[in-house]
Amino acid sequence: MARRARRPRGRFYAFRRGRWHHLKRLRRRYKFRHRRRQRYRRRAFRKAFHNPRPGTYSVRLPNPQSTMTIRFQGVIFLTEGLILPKNSTAGGYADHMYGARVAKISVNLKEFLLASMNLTYVSKIGGPIAGELIADGSKSQAAENWPNCWLPLDNNVPSATPSAWWRWALMMMQPTDSCRFFNHPKQMTLQDMGRMFGGWHLFRHIETRFQLLATKNEGSFSPVASLLSQGEYLTRRDDVKYSSDHQNRWRKGEQPMTGGIAYATGKMRLDEQQYPAMPPDPPIITTTTAQGTQVRCMNSTQAWWSWDTYMSFATLTALGAQWSFPPGQRSVSRRSFNHHKARGAGDPKGQRWHTLVPLGTETITDSYMRAPASELDTNFFTLYVAQGTNKSQQYKFGTATYALKEPVMKSDSWAVVRVQSVWQLGNRQRPYPWDVNWANSTMYWGSQP
């Protein structure tokens, strides 16, 4: 045991490892000695800009020299889908379109940035915008120039699947970017996101919290089941899911009804996992056929389906999902919410930091921001949601269904999700070449004769 000595004016010393160590005076609030914390230290201030010895983490990769924390907070409205039958061919089938109350919230930095995009009359209010917004400042007419945006073109049948949760979200980001609206009046692309955080090389997910509440009754029994999964529990087809960076792409295949077990254009997956992009009106099937049965659908004799996959209410319940009952079926309290918490990257290899902008990138383009060079759209966790009912179609496995309708001035949400998320950016590649070269080339501006 170390020898201790007391000197005048309350100084304490302890002898260990061959020398006397000066100890600070005991604080009277505590029984045992505690180290006095210094809130503002010079070294901590310097390390916020550059840490010469950042150390490593479990897989023996270097930590970034400097970091910045980003926080998101907002609300997600899980609404019923909309249909926009613009042309005459599709208009007659609008009454035969059905959808299911399912949703999928992916925890990745890309979609959180999309959720915090600008609020305009065509981007967020009242539900999702069905098509990509186009902003152009080179037109002769004032109404066609920024910040005005064009609406989706006619003679198209745009739609959005429930995986595009950011279209129904209002998210705040801290720290704020005061120039975001002026730089990106439309939805941000991967290139825009890379340039927005061009000074950072790495990023990591710290924590995300969800609080889900069912808001709409669907019969006498209609709880909303929610299940948080590590990564993407079901297969995600990134290679064909997005066109123009964020717009979903469809495929044509057989109807998901018992009887048509073969395929016409492409094999379909399990019935409960497929969300109809353009749901068919299937006829009664009496025999098993070797080809997909013709169904009435928009501009096609087959059904159009999305690559996205979802879980039914029964599947989520069988996997142990939480239930949230809507008001009227249970009194509203804290236990009325489904609480989910996701921490870290969910990576068993211990890969804490992920690539935001690849090293050595001086001109950020879409090609640099796509996988595998950038991991901006990497899914760390996925929250699957579905509402059950006592009256449902057999192949929907207890999931509530509804008829798709044209847009109205109000949206119909069946669940609300409160979200809080914390991310962190880091870099190991500053100073950039332009940090020095820009100053050298502009330092004499205005002073030369």
UniProtKB/Swiss-Prot annotation:
Expression induction: VP1 and VP2 are detected 12 hours post infection, while VP3 only after 24 hours.
Coiled coil: none
Keyword terms, alphabetized: Capsid protein, DNA-binding, Host nucleus, Host-virus interaction, Late protein, T=1 icosahedral capsid protein, Viral attachment to host cell, Viral penetration into host cytoplasm, Viral penetration into host nucleus, Virion, Virus endocytosis by host, Virus entry into host cell
GO terms, molecular function: DNA binding
A GO-annotated cellular component: T=1 icosahedral viral capsid
Signal sequence annotation: none
Compartments in which it is found: Host nucleus; Virion
Region (Nuclear localization signals): 6-47
Statement: the UniProt record of this protein carries the keyword Cytoplasm: no
Swiss-Prot/TrEMBL GO biological process terms: endocytosis involved in viral entry into host cell; viral penetration into host nucleus; virion attachment to host cell
InterPro entries registered for this protein in UniProt: Capsid_protein
Start and end residues of each stretch annotated as DNA-binding: 1-43
TM spans (from-to): none
Pfam families on file: Gyro_capsid
UniProt key word rRNA-binding: no
Functional description taken from the UniProt entry: Self-assembles to form the virion icosahedral capsid with a T=1 symmetry. This very small capsid (25 nm in diameter) allows the virus to be very stable in the environment and resistant to some disinfectants, including detergents. Essential for the initial attachment to host receptors. After attachment, the virus is endocytosed and traffics to the nucleus. The capsid protein binds and transports the viral genome and Rep across the nuclear envelope.
Family: Belongs to the gyrovirus capsid protein family.
Self-association and partners: Homomultimer (Potential). Interacts with Rep; this interaction relocates Rep into the nucleus.
Protein name as it appears in the record: Capsid protein
Organism (species): Chicken anemia virus (isolate Australia/CAU269-7/2000)
Lineage of the species this protein comes from: Viruses, Viruses incertae sedis, Anelloviridae, Gyrovirus, Gyrovirus chickenanemia
